[in-house]
A protein has these predicted regions:
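Glycine-rich phosphate-binding loop and adjoining helix at the ATP-binding site
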Residues: 55, 63-64, 92-137
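Short glycine-rich anion-binding loops that position phosphate/pyrophosphate groups of nucleotides
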Residues: 32, 89-92
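Short glycine-aspartate micro-motif
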Residues: 24-28, 81-85, 132
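N-terminal phosphate-binding loop and adjacent alpha-helix
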Residues: 45-80, 108-117
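Short glycine-rich, Thr/Ser-proximal phosphate-binding strand/loop in the N-terminal lobe
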Residues: 20-62, 98-101
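Intrinsic-disorder-associated, low-complexity terminal segments enriched in Asp/Asn/His/Tyr and depleted
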Residues: 3, 8-10
Length: 137
């Protein structure tokens, strides 16, 4: 994985597209709130913002909330968003971005939903942005 990341950075430098303006949306998804910020490749990020999680709502409301948060953070990005990192509680299929939470009284409504495609469908401006799902600690 590290090799591919280095290869990608090198390509961006070679083709003149540069990564200096490329931004990443960072989300820490909790049951009560979602913390979010925007970062550049050097780790310089905006102030962390807090949003209500709506973890006990319907599928549509949860997905619309994720999309709304991404849109708000995109406005803070001075450049294009090339990636979205989501730290999210388990059980969760982190490789495929699919929630496996059931019976936890949070995010039950998004069980089995592929989050990347659902969020991109609601926020087409994310285009080819890559998603990375990580276990929250």
């Amino acid at each position: 994985m590290a090799y591919k990341q280095k290869e990608y950075r090198d390509k961006m430098k070679r083709d003149g597209s540069g990564m200096e303006k490329k931004k990443y949306i960072l989300l820490d998804v909790g049951g009560t709130e979602i913390k979010g910020s925007v970062s550049d490749r050097n780790g310089v990020r905006t102030k962390i913002r807090k949003f209500p999680a709506q973890a006990q709502k319907s599928t549509e409301k949860i997905l619309d909330n994720f999309a709304k948060i991404c849109r708000e953070l995109m406005r803070e990005a001075d450049g294009s968003v090339v990636g979205v990192g989501m730290a999210i509680p388990g059980p969760f299929d982190y490789e495929n971005g699919i929630s496996r939470m059931q019976g936890l009284n949070k995010y039950d409504a998004i069980y089995g939903i592929p989050l990347e495609s659902e969020i991109k469908a609601r926020v087409p401006e994310l285009g080819s942005a890559r998603f990375l799902f990580l276990h929250d600690i």
